[in-house]
Curated annotation (Swiss-Prot):
SUPFAM superfamilies, per database record: Carbamoyl phosphate synthetase, large subunit connection domain, Glutathione synthetase ATP-binding domain-like, Methylglyoxal synthase-like, PreATP-grasp domain
SMART domains (UniProt xref): CPSase_L_D3, GARS_A, MGS
Region annotation Carbamoyl phosphate synthetic domain: where it falls in the sequence: 547-929
Keyword line: Amino-acid biosynthesis, Arginine biosynthesis, ATP-binding, Ligase, Magnesium, Manganese, Metal-binding, Nucleotide-binding, Pyrimidine biosynthesis, Repeat
Record-listed Mn(2+) 2 binding positions: 298, 300
Residues reported in the UniProt entry to bind Mg(2+) 3: 820, 832
Molecular function terms from GO: ATP binding; carbamoyl-phosphate synthase (ammonia) activity; carbamoyl-phosphate synthase (glutamine-hydrolyzing) activity; metal ion binding
Native organism: Bacillus cereus (strain AH187)
Name of the molecule in the record: Carbamoyl phosphate synthase large chain
Pathway involvement of the protein, from the record: Amino-acid biosynthesis; L-arginine biosynthesis; carbamoyl phosphate from bicarbonate: step 1/1; Pyrimidine metabolism; UMP biosynthesis via de novo pathway; (S)-dihydroorotate from bicarbonate: step 1/3
Enzyme class: ligase
Gene: carB
Length: 1072
């Protein structure tokens, strides 16, 4: 069937900010879809609220709207642009929910807009638990015994009939939000209440737990002609009970017999056909390991996290083809872009094993509950490819960037059998490592299988790795053993430790013995047809398939998995750098290991290597390709951390030299550079012992800001107000010694300013200056950023520009630099300089029209700023106001404190733009998920140090008609200022108290700055968590509160009696 000619304009709905459960995979799928539709000649309009993506670049669609993904704003765009159709199935759960909302509101019918791809009825049938269960019954497909419930009484009824454990699955939610497994009544009350609250239709499915079954996924495609294929089938190493986004997944499935594979394949195709899905779809199934009994768990009627993984695992571009199917093309008409010979109706075949391991944020949130269940907690994931499962798994482990090079963690060696048993049964992020440790300690596979029902096949693979460890240790220097270990994926780092040598010595030993890996191609067809894709993985085998050309090449290091502090912004910079390298006439080679991102789409670079970002794996590629050099400044801290080791291997680092990188990162060298340039900075010193730290803090005076050197995302950074807090930090947050000093600065309570600039060593160009709403002390990634600055005097702006130019030249920066300043008592101080791409690069690039990563790359390759038409100075400011607001995933991470501080906690960002600050802030806050009602109640509980400041805020809330609620201490302060307030009981009161008000939704905002104790059980922590669990905006910074007040005041009409107005005027005359 040819493509449709009755439609011209298509609106694509993006997925919004990155949150746990919905990460960079939708930037990848959305970008592919927009390009795919443009290829077919359609006019594409895109709406998305996330400025950090390639998808929201102006080149991706014909028109790009970076606006909140709410009914109000999307309807406005539809009425203005009048598209013929919308495509919502590439925007994750956000896109689907938006489509349902638009249809129900009547706006699609009013404007004559059709939904493309999967029909609305199919979306609802797959997403609505009741409709889906009915369809499965009609198809005679087994689902676990279940019941749809809308309240707790119905839940009790089901449990009384079926017994515990039961799984709670809320309808229309993302990443299992609000769901979980209930083993008793207490858990049932908590999880069902939470699930009903998070479901937009107040509906949950309660089902008998089938935890322990194998979890299998099929990624399927279907077109309007009813052609349907399986793109990839995948198997979770963790049995049912752990969310698939938190499971270690392998592809293709490893433990299914042919009969089981065909049975589940047929089921998946039968379901996609019955639903009438047109495009990509993900089917999740549970298989009893001891019989052929299976159950259908759920269907995602859209492109998902799993489809991004399946696309990268097979090379088959699901999103690209789903977009073509949406406009009427069929699988037998679409040429497979990988082979460029076969058609898209050929099912991919794999001659390798792919492993995916999730990347969790627990290194950031040590107090978080690490237990894994049906609610997703991972922020990102890594993927690796090998010729056997052992190799594939070990490559994935060292891709995680946790400083781990093998399936072993030192701190687990102390665990006794009972503790290991408990943790293996319960499942947390370290389960696979504990399984390996248990096998090392002599626990049998049978016992482990009994504890967690992990398949014997996977346990055998872990045992193979453990047995090989013993071989390696028993045969020091044996080349045959080394060869076997390398074939199994062992790293040089592990072997070096076992043989008491350096990693470099093992590397040299291998090279002398011609023991190097070859590179194989990912081609969708198991080498049956010739492939046109330059997409490779390493393995120890015979034939090398990566042909080196005679063109000059440049390697760009990617940024690895998405995690807090290093998000999709770095992938954005990486992709733009690759494009610039190609424009400059070089061959662009990228090394990365994140299956969710645009940078690992094989069509972006000239060559893509899907490999761990370790010195060993990167050097294998450099040894083969012999590039002109390596660019490290776009891959975040991941790439910067490799620079020194690469230079030791004789590799040329392009752009800012290693010496100058070190000068910006090393505290003493940086201080010396600032002193030489005459640029002030907060008083600070470096401590290498606890005693030194205490002495320095006494000398410069509390409060102090403490942090380790060389960090990203403010990891282990804290503001401490007294000695006991400092001692707690030194003991628990960092391991301080001569190689890892701790930096201690005077903490200045001032306005924070952030600048991104490009330097060629002679000229320094500044695209933009941003002002943070929150004062210094809140991490820049968690602050609301405003461009252009709204409250900076021209004099201060000139100082900032002068300092930036001086730093760019003085530090010999070639490429990008990011500087954070604090304005304190009308003086500008430098807090830090990052000689690399920052997370504000996409935001500023989009606003100013300066493609910063592209310009910086060309500078790195030798084209100076003047030749590119820029030169030195500050780019003229835009007229509109732009706001970058952070987005948090606290609802997914139980027992994490939501207080903002110098350690970064946000997972994503949104942008709001308008003619005034108030309007831009409104859009930014609404897009980030904060509801801004014009009236209601606000609970105020603040620390003593904030009481004076809180009075002015309380008064302003009262002025616009809000009710004020406060506990006794704060209430008394308000009453003394004649501000009406209702006293509420503290949280330890037996009677109706503050937490009850939050639980019952009787407060719209909670302002809480209670001193954060080191024990999370403190009152403030409980208030903040209760707010998050109940979807109430909890403001822990008075600066953020003021920003919200500005918005509320601009939305609210004043209501003053004439007498009040007259009195005010008379007062002004008297004081004139």
């Amino acid at each position: 069937m040819p493509k449709r000619l009755d439609i011209n304009t298509i609106l694509v709905i993006g997925s919004g900010p990155i949150v746990i459960g919905q990460a960079a995979e939708f930037d990848y799928s959305g970008t592919q879809a927009c390009q795919s539709l443009k290829e077919e000649g359609y006019k594409v309009i895109l709406v998305n609220s996330n400025p950090a993506t390639i998808m929201t670049d102006t080149a991706t669609a014909d028109k790009v709207y970076i606006e909140p993904l709410t009914l109000e704003f999307v309807s406005r765009i539809i009425r203005k642009e009048r598209p013929d159709a919308i495509l919502p199935t590439l925007g994750g759960q956000t896109g689907l929910n938006m489509a349902v909302e638009l249809a129900k509101s009547g706006v699609l019918e009013e404007c004559g807009v059709e939904i493309l791809g999967t029909k609305l009825s199919a979306i609802e049938q797959a997403e609505d638990r009741d409709l889906f269960r009915t369809l499965m019954q009609d198809l005679n497909e087994p689902t676990p015994p279940s019941e749809i419930i809308h309240n707790l009484d119905e839940a009790y009824g089901f449990v009384n009939e079926i017994g515990y454990p039961v799984i709670v699955r809320p309808a229309f939610t993302l990443g299992g939000t609000g769901g979980g497994i209930c083993h008793n009544e207490e858990e049932l009350i908590e999880i069902v209440t939470s699930g009903l609250k998070h479901s937009p239709v107040t509906q949950c499915l309660l089902e008998k737990s089938i935890a322990g079954c194998k979890e299998i996924e099929y990624e399927v495609m279907r077109d309007s002609n009813d052609n349907a294929i399986v793109v990839c089938n995948m198997e979770n190493i963790d049995p049912v009970g752990v969310h698939t986004g938190d499971s270690i997944v392998v592809a293709p499935s490893q433990t299914l017999s042919d009969r089981e594979y065909q049975m589940l394949r047929n089921t998946s195709l039968r379901i996609i056909r019955a639903l009438g899905i047109e495009g990509g779809c993900n089917v999740q199934l549970a298989l009893d390991p001891y019989s052929f009994q299976y159950y259908v768990i759920e269907v995602n009627p859209r492109v998902s996290r799993s489809s991004a993984l399946a696309s990268k695992a097979t090379g088959y571009p699901i999103a690209k083809l789903a977009a073509k199917i949406a406009v009427g093309l069929t699988l037998d008409e679409i040429v497979n872009p990988v082979t460029q010979k076969t058609y898209a109706c050929f099912e991919p075949a794999l001659d390798y094993v792919v492993s995916k391991i999730p990347r969790w944020p627990f290194d950031k949130f040590e107090s978080a509950n690490r237990t894994l269940g049906t609610q997703m907690k991972a922020t990102g994931e890594v993927m690796s490819i090998g010729r056997n499962l052992e190799e594939s798994l070990l490559k994935a482990v060292r891709s995680l960037e946790l400083g781990i090079y093998h399936l072993e963690l030192d701190h687990l060696k102390e665990l006794d059998k009972e503790t290991m048993k408990k943790r293996i049964i319960k499942a947390d992020d370290e389960r696979l490592f504990i399984v390996a440790e248990a096998i090392r300690q002599g626990v049998t596979k049978e016992e482990i299988n009994e504890w967690c029902e992990m398949d014997f096949f996977f346990l055998q693979k872990v045992e193979n790795i453990v047995n090989m460890e013993r071989e390696v240790k028993a045969n020091v220097g044996n080349m045959e053993v080394l060869q076997t270990a390398k074939e199994m994926g062992f790293s040089d780092h592990y072997i070096a430790a076992a043989w008491n040598k350096t990693e470099r010595e093992i590397y040299d030993m291998r090279k002398e013995n011609n023991m190097t890996p070859v590179f194989k191609m990912v081609d969708t067809c198991a080498a049956e047809f010739e492939s046109a894709t330059p997409y490779y993985y390493s393995t120890y085998a015979d034939e090398n398939e990566s042909i080196v050309t005679d063109r000059k090449s440049v390697v760009v290091l990617g940024s690895g998995p998405i995690r807090i502090g290093q998000g999709v912004e770095f992938d954005y910079a990486t992709v733009h750098s690759v494009w610039a390298i190609k424009e400059a006439g070089y061959e662009a080679i990228i090394i990365n290991n994140n299956p969710e991102t645009v940078s690992t789409d094989f069509s972006i670079s000239d060559k893509l290597y899907f490999e761990p970002l370790t010195i060993e794996d990167v050097m294998h590629i450099i040894d083969l390709e012999k590039p002109e050099g390596v660019i490290v400044q776009f891959g975040g801290q991941t790439a910067i951390n490799l620079a020194a080791k690469l230079e030791e291997h004789g590799v040329k680092i392009l752009g800012t030299s290693l010496e100058d990188l070190d000068r910006a990162e090393d505290r003493d060298k940086f201080e010396a550079a600032l002193t030489k340039l005459g640029i002030p900075q907060p008083v600070g010193k470096t401590a290498t012992t606890v005693e030194q730290a205490v002495a320095i803090a006494e000398e410069i005076g509390y409060p102090v800001l403490v942090r380790p050197s060389y960090v990203l995302g403010g990891r282990a950074m804290e503001i401490v107000y007294r000695q006991e807090e400092l001692l707690h930090y030194m003991k628990n947050a960092v391991k301080v010694h001569a190689d890892h000093p701790v930096l201690i600065d005077r903490y200045m309570v001032g306005k924070e300013i952030e600048v991104d600039a490009i330097s060629d060593g002679e000229n320094v160009f500044i695209p933009g200056i941003m002002e943070h709403i929150e004062r210094a002390g809140v991490h820049s990634g968690d602050s609301i950023g405003v461009y252009p600055p709204q409250s900076l005097s021209e004099k201060l702006k000139e100082q900032i520009i002068e300092h930036t130019i001086a730093l760019g030249k003085g530090l010999n920066i070639v490429g990008l630099l990011n500087i954070q300043f604090v304005v304190f008592k009308d003086q500008v101080y430098v807090i830090e300089v990052n000689p690399r791409a920052s997370r504000t690069v996409p935001f500023l690039s989009k606003i100013t029209g300066v493609p910063m990563a592209n310009v910086a790359t060309k500078v790195i390759l030798g084209q100076n700023l003047v030749e590119q038409g820029y030169g030195t100075g500050y780019h003229p400011e835009e007229k509109e106001v732009y706001v970058k607001a952070p987005v948090f995933s606290f609802a997914k991470l139980r027992s994490v404190d939501t207080t903002l501080g110098p350690e970064m906690k946000s997972t994503g960002e949104v942008m709001g733009k308008d003619l005034t600050l108030e309007k831009a802030l409104y859009k930014g806050l609404v897009a980030s998920g904060i509801n801004i009602p014009t009236h209601g109640s606000v609970i105020i509980t603040v620390a003593d140090k904030d009481k004076e400041e809180a009075m002015e805020i309380a008064k302003r809330f009262h002025e616009i008609g809000y009710n004020l609620l406060a506990t006794a201490g704060t209430a008394q302060s308000l009453a003394e200022q004649n501000i009406p307030v209702q006293v509420v009981n503290k949280i330890d009161s037996e009677e109706y108290n503050l937490l009850d008000i939050i639980r019952q939704g009787k407060a719209q905002f909670v302002i809480n700055t209670l001193t954060k104790g080191k024990q999370p059980a403190r009152d403030g922590f409980r208030i903040r968590r209760e707010s998050v669990e109940n979807g109430v905006a909890c403001l822990t910074s008075l600066d953020t509160t003021r920003a919200i007040l500005r918005v509320l005041e601009s939305m609210t009409f004043s209501a003053h009696s004439m007498k009040e107005i007259t009195q005010t005027k008379r007062h002004e005359v008297v004081h004139a």
